[in-house]
Swiss-Prot record:
Species this chain originates from: Shewanella loihica (strain ATCC BAA-1088 / PV-4)
Domain MPN: from-to ranges: 102-224
Domain of life per record: Bacteria
Binding site for Zn(2+): H173, H175, D186
CDD domains referenced in this protein's UniProt entry, alphabetically: MPN_DUF2466 (cd08071)
Molecular function, one GO term: metallopeptidase activity
Taxonomic lineage from the root: Bacteria, Pseudomonadati, Pseudomonadota, Gammaproteobacteria, Alteromonadales
Motif interval(s): JAMM motif: 173-186
Pfam families: RadC, UPF0758_N
PANTHER family, sorted: DNA REPAIR PROTEIN RADC, UPF0758 PROTEIN YEES-RELATED
Gene Ontology biological process terms, A to Z: proteolysis
UniProt similarity note: Belongs to the UPF0758 family.
PROSITE patterns: MPN (PS50249), UPF0758 (PS01302)
Protein keywords: Hydrolase, Metal-binding, Metalloprotease, Protease, Zinc
Protein name as it appears in the record: UPF0758 protein Shew_3481
Length: 225
C-alpha cells in the first residue's frame, strides 16, 4: 500500500509533525527522504528493503550509486537525495566547529567526529589542530586505509602541526567494522604520537576512536596522561 493510501495521520511525515522526529524508526526517517516508493510498495517498505539489504544505516549511506541501484526503485535521483542529506549533516557539524571556535564542549567534538567519520567504509586517521587557547585551527584527514602503527607516521603529524602552528591536537580515527573499542595498535600509535609531539612542546589532548554509534576517548580512560 502506498503511503498516500494510509489512514490519515499514519504516514511518516505526519508522525514526524505530530510526535517529533525522534519518534520515527530508521525506516520511517529514510522514507521521508525517499519521498515515495514503487507501485504497490510504500516508501517505508522500500526503506526496510534497503536497510535489510545493506544491514543498517551506516553501510547504506556508504554505498555507491551502482550498489544502491541494485535495489529496485532506487536510481540516481534517490541516491542524490541521500547524499545531500549526509552532506548537510556534515556541514552543520562543520559550522559548529568552525575555525576560531574555542573547543570547550566534549560533546560538540564527539558529534563533529561522528558525523565526519562514522559512515566511512575505510579507515581514516585525522587530526584536529588547536591553538594555545584551544580554538580550532583546522581538521585534517592525514591517512587512509588500514590504520596501524606502521601506517601512521609521527613525522608527518609533527610536520603538519608545525606548519599550522598548533599548540595542541586531538587525533582520531574510525573503525569501519563498527566497534569503537581501541586495539593494542591504537594504543601504540597514541604513545608514539604523544612522544613525538612532546619533542616540539605540543600537547596531545585526546585520541578518539569512532565506531558506528559511539566514540571511545583515550583521555576519559586515563590513557593520555
Amino acid at each position: 500500500m502506498a503511503i498516500k493510501d494510509w489512514p490519515q495521520g499514519e504516514g511518516p511525515r505526519e508522525k514526524l509533525l505530530r510526535s517529533g522526529v525522534a519518534q520515527l524508526s530508521d525506516a520511517e526517517l529514510l522514507a521521508v527522504l525517499l519521498r515515495n516508493g514503487l507501485k504497490g510498495q510504500s516508501a517505508v517498505s522500500l526503506a526496510r528493503v534497503m536497510l535489510t539489504h545493506f544491514g543498517g544505516l551506516r553501510a547504506l549511506f556508504s554505498a555507491s550509486l551502482s550498489e544502491l541501484c541494485d535495489i529496485q526503485g532506487i536510481g540516481p535521483v534517490k541516491y542524490a537525495q541521500l547524499q545531500a542529506a549526509i552532506e548537510l549533516s556534515k556541514r552543520i557539524a562543520q559550522e559548529n566547529l568552525q575555525r576560531g571556535k574555542i573547543l570547550s564542549d566534549p560533546d560538540l567534538t564527539r558529534d563533529y567526529l561522528m558525523r565526519q567519520l562514522a559512515d566511512r567504509a575505510y579507515e581514516v586517521f585525522a587530526i584536529l589542530l588547536l591553538d594555545s587557547q584551544h580554538r580550532v585551527i583546522q581538521f585534517v584527514e592525514l591517512f587512509r586505509g588500514t590504520i596501524d602503527s606502521a601506517s601512521v607516521y609521527p613525522r608527518e603529524v609533527v610536520s603538519l602541526v608545525l606548519e599550522k602552528k598548533a599548540a595542541a591536537v586531538i587525533v582520531c580515527h574510525n573503525h569501519p567494522s563498527g566497534g569503537a573499542e581501541p586495539s593494542h595498535a591504537d594504543r601504540r600509535i597514541t604513545e608514539r604520537l604523544k612522544y613525538a609531539l612532546a619533542t616540539i612542546d605540543v600537547s596531545l589532548l585526546d585520541h578518539m576512536v569512532v565506531g558506528d554509534r559511539e566514540i571511545v576517548s583515550f583521555a576519559e580512560r586515563g590513557w593520555i596522561d
